[in-house]
């Protein structure tokens, strides 16, 4: 499977070329969107007028498809010179924490991944509060994507996580986690999507998960996390 993403407003025409064989038929899912592509030779064309997450499938093949993530344009981009902002520009970034391969996030911090930013490491929120992780950048093959432990008020919005070896997002004994417009792919054993252990007040909204283990799993006590789980909602996903 392959993936493309872009930001837009208004209307956009999407032109797709199949470059590895004859294009006999194509479908754009979810079918509920009612998108009927025009086919011309090995090209297909369709129009979008709002942000969507789509699967373009060729010749009835659901596995070797093209994921199209049409994102809204981000408004109010954080100031990269703000001391409370961790700003990752387009390019490849590796953490200085070589042993854990993690970017550690303090309280009252906004993490912004610019489009084209690729982080080769995990993001860790441990015993913090009031954290935002935003942008249309990517985490690439981290040991774990985003870890939220013993924390409060964490927002994750817009990023893509590709081939995390374990959880894309894990929450442990935390409160007030919101996840929006997240895209996640994984292929290994134990590579869950979103797992929550003893968490409360969690909102999962408008996410796309193609994971090789559980897409979403909810636990009470597990490992060093204690307490019940409550008020966890999954919307538009």
Show where each model-derived region lies.
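Right-handed parallel beta-helix
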Residues: 108-110, 115, 129-139, 152-163, ...
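N-terminal domain-start segments of secreted/luminal proteins
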Residues: 20, 70-109
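Short, recurring structural edge motifs at helix starts
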Residues: 96-100, 191-193, 220-224
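Beta-strand-enriched, solvent-exposed domains that form extended recognition/catalytic surfaces
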Residues: 1-80
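Extracellular beta-strand-rich solenoid/capping regions of secreted or surface-exposed proteins
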Residues: 4, 46-48, 93-110, 118-134, ...
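Short hydrophobic beta-strand that contains or immediately precedes a catalytic carboxylate
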Residues: 87-88, 112-113, 123
């Amino acid at each position: 499977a392959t993936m493309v993403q872009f930001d837009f407003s208004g209307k956009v025409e999407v032109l797709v070329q199949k470059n590895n064989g004859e294009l006999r038929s194509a479908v754009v899912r979810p079918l509920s969107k009612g998108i009927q592509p025009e086919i011309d030779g090995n090209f297909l064309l369709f129009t979008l007028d709002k942000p969507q997450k789509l699967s373009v499938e060729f010749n009835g093949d659901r596995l070797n498809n093209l994921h199209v993530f049409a994102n809204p344009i981000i408004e109010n981009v954080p100031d990269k010179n703000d001391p409370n902002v961790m700003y990752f520009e387009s390019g490849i970034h590796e953490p200085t924490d070589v042993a854990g391969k993690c970017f550690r996030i303090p309280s009252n911090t906004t993490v912004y991944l610019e489009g084209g930013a690729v982080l080769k490491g995990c993001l860790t929120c441990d015993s913090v509060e009031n954290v935002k992780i935003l942008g249309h950048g990517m985490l690439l093959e981290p040991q774990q994507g985003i870890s939220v432990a013993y924390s409060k008020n964490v927002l994750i919005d817009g990023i893509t996580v590709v081939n995390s070896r374990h959880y894309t997002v894990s929450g442990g004994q935390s409160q007030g986690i919101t996840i929006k417009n997240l895209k996640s792919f994984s292929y290994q054993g134990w590579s869950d999507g979103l797992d929550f252990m003893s968490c409360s007040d969690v909102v999962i909204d408008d996410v796309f998960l193609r994971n090789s283990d559980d897409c979403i799993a909810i636990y009470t006590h597990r490992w060093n996390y204690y307490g019940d789980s409550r008020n966890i909602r999954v919307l538009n996903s």
